[in-house]
Design a protein with these regions (language model features):
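Conserved, structured core segments of small domains
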Residues: 1-102
Length: 102
């Protein structure tokens, strides 16, 4: 199944401002993970100026919907976001595909 990377660019004072929105953001992330949509997610560090979230699905709709619902986006902590298709060439997913084609 295809992967999609959701890239976030954050405001300079993101860490200082995220507190009141963090619980809701994490709730949305955990729900997406429980549905099998969100595979990995986390903030970028040094500097903490963005985040990367990896989704899996037939199309980018789940990643796009997550961004539109995310309180970080809705409250201006994320200045820009974009979703890109991600081709995995090394990892568990590639082993599974190799086994299926054998």
């Amino acid at each position: 199944m295809p992967y999609y990377a959701l890239f976030y660019e954050a405001v300079d004072d993101f860490i200082a401002r995220r507190g009141e929105f963090r619980d809701e953001h994490l709730r949305l992330a955990r729900e997406a993970h429980a549905r099998g949509e969100l595979v990995l997610a986390g903030a970028l560090a040094d500097p903490a100026d963005g985040a990367l979230l990896i989704f899996q699905g037939e199309n980018p709709a789940a990643a796009e919907a997550f961004a539109r619902r995310d309180p970080y986006v809705k409250n201006g902590l994320i200045t820009t976001w974009k979703v890109r298709s991600w081709t995995v060439v090394v990892g568990n997913e590639t082993r599974a595909r190799s086994a299926e084609s054998a």
